[in-house]
């Protein structure tokens, strides 16, 4: 954006009202006014967007393509205004027009392109890449309905389509001229050329057109604008008039429906074959389109020479979903650009890098050979050859022990195509996302690969963008921080450490706690508006917001709430500090245990919140449809940050970082990035409990853990567990929560009881909670510790993470603007 002109922006917004809605701005409703303003803001961004690309091309900058199934962007309007170099003037214009910026922001739906931490990390990374001045493109799918909109009906999660695009997205630009063909099914014929080389011809395939939609990613106050490119799918032939005229109405639109299915939802239920096939189809669809575009764009700028691609292009594979990129890049280089296998392989390995986000075996994707080879016949041929050559390398390296190694390391084995193995073998760099996670990968899950390729492995601890999670989400605290230490923290979070000197300052403590109270009041209003529950602003706001999964142990949290309720009922005479438990979580549609846990939380809430005898000492709140925009209200208000995953199971976590930055204290296990948070802030300013990762791994190996011993020997825990099956929280169906009870205590041969050691850690968790509540009542101690948490969050900026990727993996140079 060049010199900012307030009068021109004002006029443009008014003109947009007429152009888009044929009415005056004053006559528009909130949603319409949002579109009029957003279109004008997009116009302010365009010049910088074009100039960024122009400069990057002139300077021949290397570009990173961040390939991810998810981008959990939140809303764009407020973020774009904040990052623009003229954000104060823009706010003034909006107010002078009689509009309310926060109401306009609320009129924008959250972008339904992601679900959990994986997608939010990708969004934070894009913000950091643009702010740091690197040339980047995020590549994903333009989901029509996203993951789902969560409704809570009678305490149960109900999944409803999230039709976020129904009014259009004013920040996206359709780039039909850059459409790519993606092929599915069919077969491959081998043709020998005159020079003896083999050519592979894909025949009988279904063709889908991938159409890119580009949205701007605005760097903070630096005129750099990167791109998020998401792909829409369209059949080559959308309508068969011939079939229609014959009365075959379904068949007439069959191709169109097949293409449309690819982009309908994020993570379709894969409990059945059709769902599995659709997931693989989605992954290949956006990867093929993105890889083709990246290679073609590079070749066009470099006089048709593809051999130095790795010098100017980097593909970062965000988890296992995009790992088919390894084989697709090989296909493009060999089939479209006629390179030899060895030439193509060297380029591919040097271009691709893989981030592992989990040690959970079920999350490391595998595809049945029959499905993979049928849907992607040419890609399967390439994967077979990569696997054959890799197995040969293993045989040479481990002569005496080769077959045992191959059984553990092959890409294709036991009827499955293992995508994490393809990613590791086909990348020059493999990273974990927290120090503990990376060590577990090297010593446990990926040990054989680490032995073979030690130089590929490194750690890149995750981070968050302070611009979204402090400057935007908590403007009052952000202003206070700037008043104390200046504003350099906005682009260099290490500066926030300077706040530590204010931790003992009584005036600063009182200011900090007043800001926290204002944020709690805002959240209390939100809860009353959305849940109809009145919460005590002076109570502890105990927050657990994250995907619902057994290893994250939301169940342990609610069991503790049930225990507290019993204590209050048994001892009404005891002093008990008021406590508000706040949950936000979505469960995958096919994940029965997770969905039943949501029902339990809501059933417990129903009983406790309606029991007048406990005088509001406990309240339980489940925030429906947890998303970025609700996180921006919840996180600044939190007192306790619940990070209670089974040690060794959480790769990193990022809600722990967001909550820490906003002055919440961690109650958690030594897992994921918690380990590094405790190192930064000091164990005395957090509440750590439970087994270590080594202890968990040891118990898993020796299988000596017997949860029934706890049931038999701890009367209070036994009582809580019995309330799951005696109808206490479900009088209409006493057996409703039996599956949760069984998961904790079932000792049938086929099952492992209490797989995530909830009962093993429960007593320690209760003690940590008690300790935290005791400290919370010492307001001076708490204020000091809260300020120190904010002050020591500097390491956890995604800016730091990105600079590590740049230095060790991508080797990018900044764009000079």
Language model features with spans:
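A conserved ligand/cofactor-binding region detector
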Residues: 1-817
């Amino acid at each position: 954006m060049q010199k900012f002109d307030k009068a021109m922006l004002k006029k443009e917004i008014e003109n947009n009202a007429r152009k888009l809605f044929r009415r005056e701005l004053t006559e528009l409703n909130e949603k319409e006014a949002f579109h009029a303003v957003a279109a004008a803001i997009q116009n302010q961004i365009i010049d910088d967007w074009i100039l960024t690309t122009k400069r990057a091309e002139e300077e021949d900058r290397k570009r990173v393509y961040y390939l991810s199934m998810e981008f959990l962007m939140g809303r764009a309007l407020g973020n774009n205004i904040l990052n623009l170099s003229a954000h104060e003037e823009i706010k003034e214009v909006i107010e002078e027009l009689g509009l309310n910026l926060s109401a306009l922001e609320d009129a924008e739906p959250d972008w339904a392109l992601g679900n959990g931490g994986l997608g939010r990390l990708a969004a934070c990374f894009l913000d950091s890449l643009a702010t740091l001045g690197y040339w980047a493109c995020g590549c994903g799918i333009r989901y029509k309905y996203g993951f789902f909109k969560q409704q809570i009906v009678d305490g149960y999660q109900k999944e409803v389509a999230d039709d976020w695009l129904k009014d259009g997205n004013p920040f996206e630009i359709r780039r039909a001229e850059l459409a790519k063909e993606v092929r599915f099914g069919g077969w491959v014929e081998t043709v020998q050329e005159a020079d003896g080389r083999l050519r592979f011809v894909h025949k009988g395939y279904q063709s889908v057109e991938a159409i890119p939609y580009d949205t701007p990613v605005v760097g903070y106050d630096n005129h750099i604008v990167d791109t998020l490119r998401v792909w829409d799918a369209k059949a080559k032939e959308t309508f068969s008039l011939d079939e229609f005229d014959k009365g075959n109405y379904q068949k007439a639109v069959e191709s169109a429906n097949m293409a449309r299915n690819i982009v309908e939802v994020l993570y379709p239920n894969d409990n059945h074959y059709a769902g599995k096939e659709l997931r693989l189809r989605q992954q290949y669809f956006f990867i093929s389109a993105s890889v083709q575009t990246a290679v073609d764009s590079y070749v066009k700028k470099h006089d048709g020479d593809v051999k130095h691609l790795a010098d100017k292009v980097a593909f970062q594979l965000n988890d296992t979903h995009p790992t088919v990129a390894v084989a697709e890049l090989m296909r493009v280089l060999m089939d479209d650009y006629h390179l030899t296998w060895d030439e193509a392989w060297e380029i591919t390995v040097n271009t691709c890098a893989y981030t592992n986000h989990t040690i959970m075996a079920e999350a490391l994707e595998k595809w049945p050979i029959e499905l993979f080879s049928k849907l992607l016949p040419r890609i399967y041929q390439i994967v077979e050859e990569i696997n054959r050559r890799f197995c040969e390398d293993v045989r040479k390296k481990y002569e005496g022990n080769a077959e045992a190694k191959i059984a553990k390391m092959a890409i294709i084995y036991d009827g499955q195509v293992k995508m994490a193995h393809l990613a590791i073998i086909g990348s020059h760099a493999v990273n974990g996302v927290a120090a503990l996670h990376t060590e577990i990968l090297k010593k446990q899950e990926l040990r054989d690969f680490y032995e073979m390729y030690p130089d590929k492995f490194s750690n890149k601890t995750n981070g968050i963008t302070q611009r979204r999670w402090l400057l935007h989400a908590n403007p009052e605290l952000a202003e206070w921080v700037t008043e104390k230490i200046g504003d350099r923290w906005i682009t260099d979070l290490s500066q926030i450490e300077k706040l530590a000197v204010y931790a003992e300052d009584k005036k600063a403590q009182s200011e900090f706690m007043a800001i926290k109270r204002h944020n709690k009041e805002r959240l209390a209003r939100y809860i009353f508006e959305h849940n109809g529950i009145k919460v005590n602003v002076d109570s502890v706001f105990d927050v657990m917001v994250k995907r619902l999964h057994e290893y994250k142990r939301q169940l342990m949290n609610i069991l503790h709430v049930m225990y507290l309720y019993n204590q209050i009922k048994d001892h009404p005479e005891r002093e008990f500090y008021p406590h508000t438990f706040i949950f936000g979580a979505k469960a995958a549609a096919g994940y029965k245990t997770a969905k039943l846990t949501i029902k339990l939380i809501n059933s417990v809430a129903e009983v406790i919140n309606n029991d007048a005898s406990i005088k509001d000492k406990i309240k339980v709140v489940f925030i429906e449809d947890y998303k970025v925009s609700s996180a921006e209200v919840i996180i600044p208000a939190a007192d306790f940050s619940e990070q209670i995953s089974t040690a060794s199971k959480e790769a990193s976590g990022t809600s722990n970082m967001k909550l820490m930055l906003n002055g919440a204290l961690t109650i958690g296990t030594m897992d994921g990035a918690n380990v590094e948070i405790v190192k930064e802030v000091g164990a005395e300013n957090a509440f750590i409990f439970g087994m270590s990762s080594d202890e968990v791994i040891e118990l898993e190996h020796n299988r000596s853990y017997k949860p029934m011993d706890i049931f038999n020997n701890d009367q209070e825990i036994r009582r809580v567990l019995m309330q799951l099956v005696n109808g206490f929280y479900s009088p209409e169906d006493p057996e409703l929560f039996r599956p949760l009870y069984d998961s904790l205590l079932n000792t049938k041969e086929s099952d492992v009881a209490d797989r995530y050691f909830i009962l093993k850690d429960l007593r320690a968790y209760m003690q940590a909670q008690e300790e935290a509540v005791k400290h919370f009542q010492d307001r001076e101690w708490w204020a000091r510790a809260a300020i120190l948490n904010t002050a020591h969050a500097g390491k956890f900026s995604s800016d730091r993470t990105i600079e590590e990727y740049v230095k060790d993996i991508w080797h990018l140079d900044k764009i000079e603007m």
